[in-house]
Amino acid sequence: MNKIKFFAILLLISLALGFRDTGLSGLQFQAYAQSGNAHEVVFTVPVGENGIHYEGVDIPEMLTWGPAAFTVAPDGSFWIADTVGGRLLHYSPAGNLLGKIDLKGLIVGATDVEAAKAGIWVLDQASMPPKVIRLAEDGAALGKYDLPPGLHLEDGLTGIALGNRGELLVEREGDAYVTQFTDATGNPVEAMTTNGYIHKGGLFAANASGLNSLTPKRGTILAGQLHIEVETEYDLGGMQILGFGPQDDFFVALEELALNPDTGLQVDQTVRHYDALGKYMGVARVPIAEQYTYVQQGLAIGPDGSVYVLATRPDRVEVWRLVFTQSLDSILYEPPLTSNPAEIHDESFGVKACVSRNTIISTASSYRNNSKYLSSTNINGACSGRQKPRYLGGAGTYSSVSYDWGGFDTVSGFNGYMYPNTYKAGDINTTEESCSRGVDCSGFVSRTWQLTSKHSTCTLENISTQLPSKNDMLRGDIYNKCGDHVVLFSSFGSDGMWDYESTTYNSYDRVVYIYSKWTRFSGYNPRRYNNVCP
Protein backbone atom coordinates (compact mmCIF):
# COMPACT_ATOMS: atom_id res chain seq x y z
CA MET A 1 0.00 0.00 0.00
CA ASN A 2 1.16 3.62 0.40
CA LYS A 3 1.66 3.87 -3.37
CA ILE A 4 1.50 7.20 -5.14
CA LYS A 5 1.27 6.61 -8.87
CA PHE A 6 0.75 9.42 -11.31
CA PHE A 7 -0.16 7.19 -14.21
CA ALA A 8 -3.07 7.11 -16.65
CA ILE A 9 -6.12 5.52 -15.13
CA LEU A 10 -9.20 4.05 -16.75
CA LEU A 11 -12.64 4.14 -15.23
CA LEU A 12 -13.00 0.79 -13.50
CA ILE A 13 -16.73 0.43 -13.37
CA SER A 14 -19.98 2.09 -14.36
CA LEU A 15 -23.13 0.76 -12.80
CA ALA A 16 -25.12 3.32 -14.71
CA LEU A 17 -24.26 1.41 -17.88
CA GLY A 18 -25.29 -1.85 -16.37
CA PHE A 19 -21.67 -3.09 -16.19
CA ARG A 20 -21.49 -3.07 -20.00
CA ASP A 21 -18.12 -1.28 -19.94
CA THR A 22 -16.44 -3.30 -17.20
CA GLY A 23 -15.07 -6.09 -19.34
CA LEU A 24 -16.31 -8.65 -16.80
CA SER A 25 -17.48 -12.02 -17.97
CA GLY A 26 -20.81 -13.28 -16.66
CA LEU A 27 -18.96 -15.69 -14.37
CA GLN A 28 -16.70 -12.95 -13.00
CA PHE A 29 -19.61 -10.63 -12.32
CA GLN A 30 -21.61 -13.40 -10.65
CA ALA A 31 -18.71 -14.15 -8.32
CA TYR A 32 -18.41 -10.46 -7.53
CA ALA A 33 -22.12 -9.98 -6.90
CA GLN A 34 -22.22 -12.95 -4.57
CA SER A 35 -19.13 -12.18 -2.50
CA GLY A 36 -18.64 -8.44 -2.80
CA ASN A 37 -14.96 -9.33 -3.03
CA ALA A 38 -14.24 -9.76 -6.74
CA HIS A 39 -10.79 -9.85 -8.22
CA GLU A 40 -8.92 -11.26 -11.16
CA VAL A 41 -5.78 -13.31 -10.55
CA VAL A 42 -3.24 -11.76 -12.92
CA PHE A 43 -0.42 -14.20 -12.21
CA THR A 44 1.02 -16.48 -9.52
CA VAL A 45 4.49 -16.60 -7.99
CA PRO A 46 5.68 -19.86 -6.38
CA VAL A 47 7.54 -20.27 -3.11
CA GLY A 48 11.20 -21.16 -3.55
CA GLU A 49 14.27 -20.23 -5.54
CA ASN A 50 12.23 -19.03 -8.50
CA GLY A 51 9.79 -17.13 -6.33
CA ILE A 52 9.29 -15.68 -2.87
CA HIS A 53 10.26 -16.94 0.59
CA TYR A 54 8.56 -17.11 3.99
CA GLU A 55 10.12 -17.22 7.45
CA GLY A 56 8.77 -18.75 10.66
CA VAL A 57 6.44 -21.23 8.94
CA ASP A 58 4.80 -23.70 11.35
CA ILE A 59 7.22 -22.81 14.15
CA PRO A 60 5.67 -22.25 17.59
CA GLU A 61 6.25 -18.82 19.10
CA MET A 62 7.52 -17.46 15.79
CA LEU A 63 5.90 -14.85 13.58
CA THR A 64 5.37 -16.02 10.00
CA TRP A 65 6.17 -13.27 7.50
CA GLY A 66 7.17 -12.92 3.87
CA PRO A 67 7.21 -10.37 1.03
CA ALA A 68 6.83 -6.83 2.34
CA ALA A 69 6.03 -4.81 -0.78
CA PHE A 70 5.41 -4.63 -4.51
CA THR A 71 4.87 -1.97 -7.14
CA VAL A 72 3.91 -1.56 -10.79
CA ALA A 73 6.39 0.14 -13.13
CA PRO A 74 5.44 2.62 -15.88
CA ASP A 75 5.80 -0.19 -18.45
CA GLY A 76 3.27 -2.33 -16.56
CA SER A 77 5.84 -4.76 -15.16
CA PHE A 78 5.83 -5.74 -11.49
CA TRP A 79 8.55 -5.54 -8.86
CA ILE A 80 8.12 -7.70 -5.73
CA ALA A 81 10.28 -7.37 -2.60
CA ASP A 82 11.19 -10.92 -1.54
CA THR A 83 12.23 -9.56 1.84
CA VAL A 84 13.06 -12.89 3.50
CA GLY A 85 15.07 -13.99 0.46
CA GLY A 86 16.90 -10.66 0.24
CA ARG A 87 15.92 -10.09 -3.40
CA LEU A 88 13.85 -8.07 -5.81
CA LEU A 89 11.83 -10.06 -8.34
CA HIS A 90 10.86 -8.52 -11.69
CA TYR A 91 7.84 -9.86 -13.60
CA SER A 92 6.30 -8.94 -16.92
CA PRO A 93 2.66 -7.78 -17.04
CA ALA A 94 1.77 -11.39 -17.90
CA GLY A 95 3.69 -12.75 -14.92
CA ASN A 96 6.84 -14.01 -16.64
CA LEU A 97 9.97 -13.74 -14.52
CA LEU A 98 12.21 -11.10 -16.09
CA GLY A 99 14.99 -11.08 -13.54
CA LYS A 100 16.18 -11.16 -9.94
CA ILE A 101 18.28 -8.63 -8.07
CA ASP A 102 20.28 -9.92 -5.11
CA LEU A 103 20.11 -7.34 -2.32
CA LYS A 104 22.33 -9.15 0.18
CA GLY A 105 25.17 -6.90 1.21
CA LEU A 106 23.29 -3.82 0.02
CA ILE A 107 20.47 -3.68 2.55
CA VAL A 108 19.16 -5.50 5.62
CA GLY A 109 15.49 -5.79 4.67
CA ALA A 110 13.54 -4.48 1.66
CA THR A 111 10.32 -3.01 3.05
CA ASP A 112 9.11 -0.87 0.13
CA VAL A 113 9.88 -0.47 -3.55
CA GLU A 114 9.09 2.12 -6.23
CA ALA A 115 9.88 2.14 -9.96
CA ALA A 116 10.76 5.54 -11.45
CA LYS A 117 12.59 6.86 -14.50
CA ALA A 118 15.54 7.55 -12.22
CA GLY A 119 15.71 3.86 -11.26
CA ILE A 120 14.28 1.36 -8.82
CA TRP A 121 14.04 2.73 -5.29
CA VAL A 122 14.18 0.33 -2.31
CA LEU A 123 13.50 1.29 1.30
CA ASP A 124 15.42 -0.50 4.04
CA GLN A 125 13.74 0.15 7.39
CA ALA A 126 15.72 -2.54 9.21
CA SER A 127 19.22 -1.10 8.83
CA MET A 128 20.80 1.28 11.33
CA PRO A 129 20.08 3.98 10.26
CA PRO A 130 17.33 3.20 7.74
CA LYS A 131 18.23 3.96 4.14
CA VAL A 132 17.05 4.07 0.55
CA ILE A 133 18.99 2.68 -2.39
CA ARG A 134 18.57 3.41 -6.09
CA LEU A 135 19.14 0.56 -8.54
CA ALA A 136 19.23 0.10 -12.28
CA GLU A 137 17.01 -2.64 -13.68
CA ASP A 138 20.05 -4.89 -13.96
CA GLY A 139 20.73 -4.48 -10.24
CA ALA A 140 23.60 -2.01 -10.47
CA ALA A 141 23.65 0.31 -7.46
CA LEU A 142 23.14 3.93 -8.55
CA GLY A 143 22.98 5.50 -5.10
CA LYS A 144 22.65 4.70 -1.41
CA TYR A 145 21.41 7.25 1.11
CA ASP A 146 20.99 7.09 4.88
CA LEU A 147 17.76 8.67 6.06
CA PRO A 148 18.43 11.52 8.49
CA PRO A 149 17.13 11.71 12.07
CA GLY A 150 13.45 12.54 12.00
CA LEU A 151 12.82 9.94 9.29
CA HIS A 152 13.67 6.84 11.32
CA LEU A 153 11.59 3.94 12.63
CA GLU A 154 10.95 5.67 15.93
CA ASP A 155 9.70 8.69 13.96
CA GLY A 156 6.99 6.64 12.26
CA LEU A 157 8.78 5.63 9.03
CA THR A 158 6.33 3.51 7.03
CA GLY A 159 7.15 3.70 3.32
CA ILE A 160 8.23 5.57 0.21
CA ALA A 161 6.27 6.98 -2.72
CA LEU A 162 6.76 8.95 -5.92
CA GLY A 163 5.70 12.52 -6.59
CA ASN A 164 4.15 13.53 -9.90
CA ARG A 165 7.57 14.47 -11.32
CA GLY A 166 9.17 11.23 -10.13
CA GLU A 167 10.72 12.68 -6.98
CA LEU A 168 11.13 10.29 -4.05
CA LEU A 169 8.90 10.87 -1.03
CA VAL A 170 9.36 9.38 2.43
CA GLU A 171 6.18 8.55 4.36
CA ARG A 172 5.67 8.56 8.12
CA GLU A 173 2.53 7.26 9.80
CA GLY A 174 1.11 6.50 6.37
CA ASP A 175 0.35 9.84 4.74
CA ALA A 176 0.31 11.86 7.97
CA TYR A 177 3.79 13.22 7.20
CA VAL A 178 5.26 13.14 3.69
CA THR A 179 8.82 14.38 3.10
CA GLN A 180 10.39 15.01 -0.30
CA PHE A 181 13.82 13.35 -0.24
CA THR A 182 15.10 13.64 -3.84
CA ASP A 183 14.38 15.46 -7.06
CA ALA A 184 13.17 13.70 -10.21
CA THR A 185 16.72 12.74 -11.17
CA GLY A 186 17.30 10.93 -7.88
CA ASN A 187 19.50 13.52 -6.20
CA PRO A 188 18.81 14.33 -2.53
CA VAL A 189 17.27 17.73 -1.83
CA GLU A 190 16.61 19.77 1.27
CA ALA A 191 13.81 17.98 3.08
CA MET A 192 10.34 19.50 2.88
CA THR A 193 7.50 17.89 4.85
CA THR A 194 3.76 18.23 4.29
CA ASN A 195 0.75 16.68 6.01
CA GLY A 196 -0.19 14.69 2.92
CA TYR A 197 0.72 14.62 -0.76
CA ILE A 198 1.07 17.58 -3.13
CA HIS A 199 -0.65 16.92 -6.46
CA LYS A 200 -0.75 19.66 -9.09
CA GLY A 201 -0.30 22.28 -6.42
CA GLY A 202 -3.03 20.97 -4.12
CA LEU A 203 -2.69 19.15 -0.81
CA PHE A 204 -4.28 15.69 -0.61
CA ALA A 205 -4.68 13.89 2.71
CA ALA A 206 -7.06 11.44 4.35
CA ASN A 207 -7.51 11.44 8.12
CA ALA A 208 -9.67 9.39 10.46
CA SER A 209 -11.04 11.11 13.56
CA GLY A 210 -9.38 8.49 15.76
CA LEU A 211 -10.54 5.48 17.76
CA ASN A 212 -10.34 7.39 21.03
CA SER A 213 -12.23 10.40 19.64
CA LEU A 214 -15.91 11.19 20.10
CA THR A 215 -16.53 10.32 16.43
CA PRO A 216 -14.55 7.10 15.77
CA LYS A 217 -16.59 6.30 12.62
CA ARG A 218 -15.78 9.53 10.83
CA GLY A 219 -12.96 10.91 8.75
CA THR A 220 -12.12 13.68 6.31
CA ILE A 221 -10.51 13.62 2.88
CA LEU A 222 -8.74 16.81 1.84
CA ALA A 223 -8.45 16.99 -1.96
CA GLY A 224 -7.07 20.39 -2.88
CA GLN A 225 -9.92 22.80 -2.14
CA LEU A 226 -12.37 19.96 -1.54
CA HIS A 227 -13.33 18.55 1.85
CA ILE A 228 -15.03 15.15 1.69
CA GLU A 229 -16.63 13.87 4.87
CA VAL A 230 -16.57 10.10 5.35
CA GLU A 231 -18.70 8.10 7.77
CA THR A 232 -18.39 4.33 8.06
CA GLU A 233 -20.58 1.63 9.57
CA TYR A 234 -17.82 0.45 11.89
CA ASP A 235 -15.00 2.27 13.65
CA LEU A 236 -12.67 3.88 11.13
CA GLY A 237 -9.16 2.80 12.03
CA GLY A 238 -7.42 4.72 9.28
CA MET A 239 -7.48 6.30 5.82
CA GLN A 240 -4.75 7.03 3.27
CA ILE A 241 -4.48 8.51 -0.20
CA LEU A 242 -3.46 5.63 -2.47
CA GLY A 243 -2.89 7.30 -5.84
CA PHE A 244 -4.04 9.61 -8.63
CA GLY A 245 -5.26 9.41 -12.21
CA PRO A 246 -4.71 11.62 -15.28
CA GLN A 247 -8.10 13.31 -14.85
CA ASP A 248 -7.24 14.21 -11.26
CA ASP A 249 -9.35 11.36 -9.91
CA PHE A 250 -7.91 9.60 -6.88
CA PHE A 251 -8.11 6.52 -4.66
CA VAL A 252 -8.34 6.30 -0.87
CA ALA A 253 -7.67 3.19 1.24
CA LEU A 254 -9.83 2.80 4.38
CA GLU A 255 -9.65 0.40 7.33
CA GLU A 256 -12.77 -0.36 9.36
CA LEU A 257 -12.33 -2.26 12.61
CA ALA A 258 -14.35 -4.61 14.79
CA LEU A 259 -13.43 -6.88 17.68
CA ASN A 260 -14.70 -10.45 17.63
CA PRO A 261 -14.30 -11.96 21.11
CA ASP A 262 -13.55 -15.36 19.57
CA THR A 263 -11.25 -14.51 16.65
CA GLY A 264 -9.75 -11.18 17.68
CA LEU A 265 -9.37 -7.92 15.77
CA GLN A 266 -11.12 -7.82 12.40
CA VAL A 267 -10.05 -5.36 9.70
CA ASP A 268 -12.06 -4.57 6.57
CA GLN A 269 -9.77 -2.76 4.15
CA THR A 270 -11.44 -1.16 1.15
CA VAL A 271 -10.37 1.20 -1.64
CA ARG A 272 -12.66 4.08 -2.66
CA HIS A 273 -12.48 5.86 -6.01
CA TYR A 274 -13.32 9.59 -6.36
CA ASP A 275 -13.32 11.83 -9.41
CA ALA A 276 -11.64 15.25 -9.56
CA LEU A 277 -14.74 16.95 -8.14
CA GLY A 278 -14.85 14.61 -5.17
CA LYS A 279 -17.71 12.51 -6.53
CA TYR A 280 -17.73 8.95 -5.24
CA MET A 281 -17.15 6.54 -8.15
CA GLY A 282 -16.95 3.10 -6.53
CA VAL A 283 -15.37 0.79 -3.98
CA ALA A 284 -13.43 -2.48 -3.88
CA ARG A 285 -12.47 -4.77 -1.00
CA VAL A 286 -9.01 -6.02 -0.09
CA PRO A 287 -9.37 -9.52 1.42
CA ILE A 288 -7.23 -9.00 4.52
CA ALA A 289 -8.64 -12.02 6.39
CA GLU A 290 -7.57 -14.30 3.52
CA GLN A 291 -3.92 -13.24 3.62
CA TYR A 292 -1.42 -15.86 4.77
CA THR A 293 1.00 -13.17 5.89
CA TYR A 294 0.72 -9.42 6.28
CA VAL A 295 2.10 -7.36 3.38
CA GLN A 296 3.15 -3.91 4.56
CA GLN A 297 2.90 -2.37 1.09
CA GLY A 298 0.25 -4.60 -0.46
CA LEU A 299 -1.60 -2.19 -2.79
CA ALA A 300 -0.39 -0.57 -6.01
CA ILE A 301 -1.86 1.28 -8.99
CA GLY A 302 -0.72 0.33 -12.49
CA PRO A 303 -0.40 2.39 -15.69
CA ASP A 304 -3.71 0.99 -16.93
CA GLY A 305 -5.49 2.42 -13.93
CA SER A 306 -6.03 -0.93 -12.23
CA VAL A 307 -5.63 -1.37 -8.50
CA TYR A 308 -3.52 -4.42 -7.68
CA VAL A 309 -3.16 -6.49 -4.50
CA LEU A 310 -0.29 -8.77 -3.49
CA ALA A 311 -2.13 -11.76 -1.97
CA THR A 312 -0.14 -14.27 0.07
CA ARG A 313 -0.87 -18.00 0.24
CA PRO A 314 1.09 -20.78 2.00
CA ASP A 315 2.52 -22.13 -1.27
CA ARG A 316 2.52 -19.01 -3.45
CA VAL A 317 1.66 -15.36 -3.81
CA GLU A 318 -0.86 -14.02 -6.29
CA VAL A 319 -1.14 -10.63 -7.94
CA TRP A 320 -4.81 -9.61 -8.07
CA ARG A 321 -6.59 -6.90 -9.98
CA LEU A 322 -9.50 -5.51 -7.94
CA VAL A 323 -13.01 -5.00 -9.35
CA PHE A 324 -14.98 -1.95 -8.22
CA THR A 325 -18.69 -1.53 -7.55
CA GLN A 326 -20.98 1.08 -6.00
CA SER A 327 -21.35 -0.59 -2.59
CA LEU A 328 -20.24 -3.56 -0.51
CA ASP A 329 -21.96 -5.63 2.15
CA SER A 330 -20.43 -5.56 5.61
CA ILE A 331 -18.24 -8.50 6.61
CA LEU A 332 -17.30 -7.44 10.15
CA TYR A 333 -18.51 -8.92 13.42
CA GLU A 334 -21.68 -7.49 14.92
CA PRO A 335 -22.05 -8.06 18.68
CA PRO A 336 -25.41 -9.38 19.89
CA LEU A 337 -27.86 -6.63 20.75
CA THR A 338 -28.32 -8.13 24.21
CA SER A 339 -24.63 -8.37 25.03
CA ASN A 340 -23.24 -6.47 27.98
CA PRO A 341 -19.76 -4.95 28.02
CA ALA A 342 -17.26 -7.40 29.45
CA GLU A 343 -15.73 -6.55 32.78
CA ILE A 344 -12.00 -6.56 33.32
CA HIS A 345 -11.18 -8.67 36.36
CA ASP A 346 -7.98 -8.81 38.35
CA GLU A 347 -7.10 -12.50 38.53
CA SER A 348 -3.58 -12.11 39.94
CA PHE A 349 -4.03 -13.96 43.19
CA GLY A 350 -1.33 -13.55 45.76
CA VAL A 351 0.34 -10.57 44.11
CA LYS A 352 0.88 -7.72 46.54
CA ALA A 353 2.15 -4.84 44.43
CA CYS A 354 0.80 -3.80 41.06
CA VAL A 355 2.99 -2.72 38.14
CA SER A 356 2.55 0.83 36.91
CA ARG A 357 2.17 1.65 33.24
CA ASN A 358 5.09 4.05 33.52
CA THR A 359 7.27 1.17 34.71
CA ILE A 360 6.15 -1.04 31.82
CA ILE A 361 6.88 1.58 29.17
CA SER A 362 10.11 2.69 30.84
CA THR A 363 11.35 -0.90 30.77
CA ALA A 364 10.34 -1.28 27.12
CA SER A 365 12.10 1.95 26.23
CA SER A 366 15.28 0.82 28.00
CA TYR A 367 15.50 -2.15 25.62
CA ARG A 368 14.97 0.02 22.55
CA ASN A 369 17.40 2.73 23.69
CA ASN A 370 20.11 0.39 24.90
CA SER A 371 23.53 1.10 23.40
CA LYS A 372 26.27 -1.52 23.49
CA TYR A 373 29.57 -2.10 21.75
CA LEU A 374 29.55 -5.53 20.13
CA SER A 375 32.85 -7.15 19.26
CA SER A 376 33.50 -9.35 16.26
CA THR A 377 33.23 -12.30 18.64
CA ASN A 378 29.79 -11.13 19.83
CA ILE A 379 28.66 -10.84 16.23
CA ASN A 380 30.43 -13.57 14.28
CA GLY A 381 31.97 -15.88 16.87
CA ALA A 382 31.37 -19.62 16.83
CA CYS A 383 27.92 -20.62 18.12
CA SER A 384 26.57 -23.87 16.71
CA GLY A 385 22.99 -23.58 15.45
CA ARG A 386 22.86 -19.80 15.74
CA GLN A 387 21.66 -17.56 12.90
CA LYS A 388 23.02 -14.04 13.26
CA PRO A 389 20.52 -11.14 13.33
CA ARG A 390 20.60 -9.47 9.93
CA TYR A 391 21.16 -5.91 11.15
CA LEU A 392 24.54 -6.83 12.64
CA GLY A 393 27.52 -6.06 10.41
CA GLY A 394 31.01 -5.50 11.73
CA ALA A 395 32.16 -4.74 15.25
CA GLY A 396 30.73 -1.50 16.58
CA THR A 397 28.19 0.14 18.85
CA TYR A 398 24.61 -0.92 18.25
CA SER A 399 21.38 0.27 19.79
CA SER A 400 18.62 -2.00 21.17
CA VAL A 401 18.75 -5.63 22.36
CA SER A 402 18.99 -8.42 19.82
CA TYR A 403 16.15 -10.84 19.10
CA ASP A 404 16.94 -14.29 20.51
CA TRP A 405 14.34 -17.03 20.07
CA GLY A 406 13.43 -18.27 23.56
CA GLY A 407 15.40 -15.42 25.14
CA PHE A 408 14.47 -13.71 28.42
CA ASP A 409 17.42 -11.45 29.19
CA THR A 410 17.23 -8.12 30.95
CA VAL A 411 19.02 -5.18 29.37
CA SER A 412 21.84 -5.30 31.92
CA GLY A 413 22.01 -9.07 31.58
CA PHE A 414 22.35 -8.83 27.80
CA ASN A 415 25.07 -6.19 28.09
CA GLY A 416 26.98 -8.27 30.64
CA TYR A 417 26.82 -11.35 28.45
CA MET A 418 28.39 -9.34 25.64
CA TYR A 419 31.22 -7.93 27.79
CA PRO A 420 33.10 -8.91 29.87
CA ASN A 421 31.68 -12.22 28.70
CA THR A 422 31.81 -13.20 25.03
CA TYR A 423 28.36 -14.55 24.26
CA LYS A 424 26.80 -13.98 20.86
CA ALA A 425 24.27 -11.22 20.22
CA GLY A 426 20.93 -12.71 19.27
CA ASP A 427 19.74 -15.74 17.34
CA ILE A 428 16.96 -15.67 14.74
CA ASN A 429 17.10 -19.44 14.38
CA THR A 430 14.27 -21.25 16.16
CA THR A 431 16.28 -23.41 18.53
CA GLU A 432 17.66 -22.32 21.87
CA GLU A 433 21.45 -22.06 21.95
CA SER A 434 23.27 -21.50 25.23
CA CYS A 435 25.90 -19.42 23.44
CA SER A 436 23.53 -16.63 22.29
CA ARG A 437 21.68 -14.01 24.32
CA GLY A 438 18.80 -11.60 23.82
CA VAL A 439 15.03 -11.62 24.08
CA ASP A 440 12.10 -12.85 21.98
CA CYS A 441 8.63 -11.32 21.68
CA SER A 442 7.00 -12.93 24.72
CA GLY A 443 10.19 -12.77 26.76
CA PHE A 444 10.27 -9.04 26.10
CA VAL A 445 6.66 -8.55 27.23
CA SER A 446 7.33 -10.75 30.28
CA ARG A 447 10.19 -8.45 31.28
CA THR A 448 8.21 -5.26 30.74
CA TRP A 449 5.45 -6.70 32.94
CA GLN A 450 8.14 -7.35 35.59
CA LEU A 451 7.58 -11.11 35.58
CA THR A 452 10.21 -13.33 37.20
CA SER A 453 9.77 -16.15 34.69
CA LYS A 454 9.27 -16.19 30.94
CA HIS A 455 5.77 -16.67 29.56
CA SER A 456 4.92 -17.74 26.03
CA THR A 457 2.40 -15.93 23.85
CA CYS A 458 -0.17 -18.51 24.94
CA THR A 459 0.56 -18.49 28.68
CA LEU A 460 0.50 -14.69 28.71
CA GLU A 461 -3.24 -15.17 28.32
CA ASN A 462 -3.31 -16.87 31.74
CA ILE A 463 -2.20 -13.67 33.46
CA SER A 464 -4.10 -11.16 31.34
CA THR A 465 -7.69 -10.38 30.40
CA GLN A 466 -9.09 -9.76 26.95
CA LEU A 467 -10.40 -6.22 26.61
CA PRO A 468 -14.02 -5.72 25.57
CA SER A 469 -13.06 -3.07 23.01
CA LYS A 470 -10.02 -2.25 20.92
CA ASN A 471 -10.65 1.39 21.88
CA ASP A 472 -9.89 0.56 25.54
CA MET A 473 -6.17 0.01 24.91
CA LEU A 474 -3.80 1.83 27.24
CA ARG A 475 -0.01 2.01 27.48
CA GLY A 476 1.40 -1.34 28.53
CA ASP A 477 -1.47 -3.45 27.19
CA ILE A 478 -0.73 -6.00 24.47
CA TYR A 479 -1.97 -7.23 21.13
CA ASN A 480 -1.43 -10.98 21.28
CA LYS A 481 -1.79 -13.92 18.91
CA CYS A 482 -1.31 -17.19 20.76
CA GLY A 483 1.51 -19.28 19.30
CA ASP A 484 2.56 -16.52 16.94
CA HIS A 485 3.52 -13.06 18.18
CA VAL A 486 2.84 -10.38 20.80
CA VAL A 487 3.46 -6.61 20.82
CA LEU A 488 3.32 -4.04 23.61
CA PHE A 489 0.88 -1.22 22.90
CA SER A 490 2.20 2.31 23.36
CA SER A 491 -0.37 4.66 21.80
CA PHE A 492 -2.83 5.23 18.99
CA GLY A 493 -1.32 6.83 15.90
CA SER A 494 -2.70 8.83 13.01
CA ASP A 495 -4.17 5.78 11.27
CA GLY A 496 -2.73 2.90 13.24
CA MET A 497 -0.82 2.29 16.45
CA TRP A 498 2.62 2.57 18.03
CA ASP A 499 4.13 -0.42 19.78
CA TYR A 500 7.30 -1.91 21.24
CA GLU A 501 8.22 -5.44 20.22
CA SER A 502 11.08 -7.87 19.82
CA THR A 503 10.70 -9.29 16.34
CA THR A 504 12.28 -10.75 13.22
CA TYR A 505 9.55 -9.08 11.13
CA ASN A 506 10.97 -7.08 8.20
CA SER A 507 14.44 -8.34 9.26
CA TYR A 508 14.44 -6.01 12.28
CA ASP A 509 15.81 -8.86 14.46
CA ARG A 510 15.81 -6.74 17.63
CA VAL A 511 13.58 -4.73 19.96
CA VAL A 512 11.99 -1.89 18.01
CA TYR A 513 9.53 0.95 18.55
CA ILE A 514 7.43 1.21 15.40
CA TYR A 515 4.21 2.44 13.89
CA SER A 516 1.94 -0.05 12.10
CA LYS A 517 -1.40 0.09 10.35
CA TRP A 518 -4.27 -1.93 11.80
CA THR A 519 -4.20 -4.48 8.99
CA ARG A 520 -1.00 -5.86 10.47
CA PHE A 521 -2.86 -6.95 13.62
CA SER A 522 -5.81 -8.70 12.02
CA GLY A 523 -6.54 -11.73 14.21
CA TYR A 524 -4.73 -10.37 17.29
CA ASN A 525 -6.45 -9.92 20.67
CA PRO A 526 -6.20 -6.80 22.86
CA ARG A 527 -5.30 -7.86 26.39
CA ARG A 528 -4.42 -6.27 29.73
CA TYR A 529 -2.06 -7.58 32.40
CA ASN A 530 -4.09 -8.56 35.45
CA ASN A 531 -1.60 -6.95 37.82
CA VAL A 532 -1.24 -3.57 36.12
CA CYS A 533 -2.02 -0.64 38.38
CA PRO A 534 -5.46 0.92 37.74
PLM features per residue range, with description:
Residues L451-V512:
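...with weaker cross-activation on analogous glycine-rich loops/strands in unrelated enzymes
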Residues T22-I344:
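Eukaryotic scaffold repeat domains enriched in small/polar residues
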Residues V319-S330, S490-F492, R527-P534:
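Short beta-strand-to-coil "C-cap" segments at the C-terminal boundary of structured domains/repeats
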Residues R437-S446, Q466, V486-F489:
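Mobile, glycine-rich extracellular loop/lid and propeptide segments
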Residues A8-G18:
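Bacterial N-terminal signal peptides
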Residues S339-P341, Y515-P534:
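Low-complexity, Gly/Ser/Thr/Pro-rich intrinsically disordered linker/tail segments
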Residues M1-A8:
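Bacterial N-terminal signal peptides that target proteins for export
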Residues E343-D440:
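N-terminal capping segments
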